[in-house]
């Protein structure tokens, strides 16, 4: 889960990472009131989960509360790369002597953690990596040893930070690592991390991504969910612990196992080329269990998408056998009743597949078409969706 900057700075405050005071608002009047309360020049910053805010006019310096009001009026409602600005962070402006870059992230390719640090902050880090790679330090972090002050100082040193700020920067870097671990983050990024004229180190920007797989031990993270901006079908799926991502096609997809579902998306997209450009409507992995309740929840989510014209249920029976899956489908259709009103193409394979097919055949549900192979099923689902 990506956080808004103001949410990330709440975690900064929780873990004593130095930053500038500020508050969030959704009105121009609120921005003026916060600026008045701070009593100094402020930055008015669009809250969107995308980079490039400054270039798009989403970050403005306000010398007075009235300036904050005017900037807020212009920024609210702004479209930044498809993200509409609905909230603003109004934070105290800071005098800046130098700008640096610091991040911790999960390095999936090397199965470790990575610290990245550069004296070239305040610009796109991809640009630094491309034009000045020698100025960007990439330091592997041992997950067991972590980051103490000595190692944090080494990270800053490898990032070419000036000698006079190494010790101060090390303290902040160590605190950012503590946050990264304690909050189960996959990314903590500060750009810029600045040195003030009096040699303080401040995190002026904040970007944090939290690992949704750790939600079970991070109940406090639920408050960060932007439910108003989240697709209601994705919210419904999450309530049932289903892995669902809405796409823009017409064939609903239900499968067990992420790899199988990804393969199903591919074959449906390929088959859809012959049927007017039909595409998959979603990714939905029901996991290892395909009980009637789980299948009903999955069908309820997929059928709730008005774009869906047909549904492809693609299940490989393993620990959960095909007869259990078939029974789940039949019961799920009974539980949903009239809400199940779109054709289903079902392909079963694996453990006890013949019994599973027999159950579906004998049920003889008018919405269900049983198909033997994945390619044939994808073609049938695409054909039904294009009809």
Swiss-Prot record:
Top enzyme category: ligase
Gene3D superfamilies reported for this sequence: ATP-grasp fold, A domain (3.30.1490.20), ATP-grasp fold, B domain (3.30.470.20), Succinyl-CoA synthetase domains (3.40.50.261)
One Pfam family linked to the record: ATP-grasp_2
Record keywords, A-Z: ATP-binding, Ligase, Magnesium, Metal-binding, Nucleotide-binding, Tricarboxylic acid cycle
GO CC annotations on file: cytosol; peptidoglycan-based cell wall; succinate-CoA ligase complex
Single Gene Ontology MF annotation: succinate-CoA ligase (ADP-forming) activity
Record flagged with keyword Magnesium: yes
Note accompanying the cofactor annotation: Binds 1 Mg(2+) ion per subunit.
Pathway entry: Carbohydrate metabolism; tricarboxylic acid cycle; succinate from succinyl-CoA (ligase route): step 1/1
InterPro entries (alphabetical): ATP-grasp, ATP-grasp_succ-CoA_synth-type, ATP_grasp_subdomain_1, Succ-CoA_synthase_bsu_CS, SUCC_ACL_C, Succ_CoA_ligase-like_bsu, Succinyl-CoA_synth-like
Cofactor list: Mg(2+)
Residues at which ATP binds: 45, 52-54, 94, 99
Positions contributing to Mg(2+) binding: 191, 205
Domain annotation ATP-grasp: ranges: 9-236
Residues forming coiled coils: none
List of residues binding substrate: 256, 318-320
PROSITE patterns recorded: ATP_GRASP, SUCCINYL_COA_LIG_3
Reactions listed under catalytic activity: succinate + ATP + CoA = succinyl-CoA + ADP + phosphate; GTP + succinate + CoA = succinyl-CoA + GDP + phosphate
Enzyme Commission number(s): 6.2.1.5
Gene Ontology terms describing biological process: succinyl-CoA metabolic process; tricarboxylic acid cycle
Family: Belongs to the succinate/malate CoA ligase beta subunit family.
Annotated function: Succinyl-CoA synthetase functions in the citric acid cycle (TCA), coupling the hydrolysis of succinyl-CoA to the synthesis of either ATP or GTP and thus represents the only step of substrate-level phosphorylation in the TCA. The beta subunit provides nucleotide specificity of the enzyme and binds the substrate succinate, while the binding sites for coenzyme A and phosphate are found in the alpha subunit.
Description of how the protein assembles with itself and partners: Heterotetramer of two alpha and two beta subunits.
Record-given protein name: Succinate--CoA ligase [ADP-forming] subunit beta
